[in-house]
């Protein structure tokens, strides 16, 4: 019995280590790209118009229609897109079929939206849990990453404002 408990405990620790990486005390369900060059933005299809990303901060939200926390984030992402429209482009990327995303009526997405059923960028980032957000500066460097509602590490308007002020060209 003790062997089984030890094996289960070791398996849980291994799984936890595999699924999350520490980032200044923040748990990530992805590989950390903080202060590193962001991978190339890859999408299969734009549901919205394609944004002009030149000289902009880019907030990318990996999400799905079935994900409760992802849907909870949409109104706040809408607000970020409005509040920081001069400096920030918000993009939601789902790996679901375009029809599935278009069927979702509430909440309404008011920012740029794209589909990548192959999850190319999501795989490059090693994302294993959603929602997962990265904020990229105009030079292509990741300046914020993670689960936007993680206690003590929330992505807020103040956080975005501070990053824009710090890393704006």
Regions flagged by a language model, labelled:
Residues 33-58:
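A short beta-strand-turn-helix
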Residues 71-109, 117-124:
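Structural microenvironment flanking redox-active thiols in thiol-disulfide oxidoreductases
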Residues 56-58, 62-66, 97, 129:
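Short pre-active-site segment immediately N-terminal to redox-active cysteine/selenocysteine motifs
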Residues 103-109, 116-163:
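Thiol/disulfide oxidoreductase modules built on the thioredoxin-like
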Residues 58-61, 89-93, 112-114, 135:
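Structural recognition of the beta-strand scaffold that forms the well-ordered cores
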Residues 65-72, 132:
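C-type cytochrome heme c attachment motif
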Residues 4-13:
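Sec-dependent N-terminal signal peptides
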Residues 17-40, 169:
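N-proximal helix/coil linker or "cap" segments that precede and/or mark the start of modular domains
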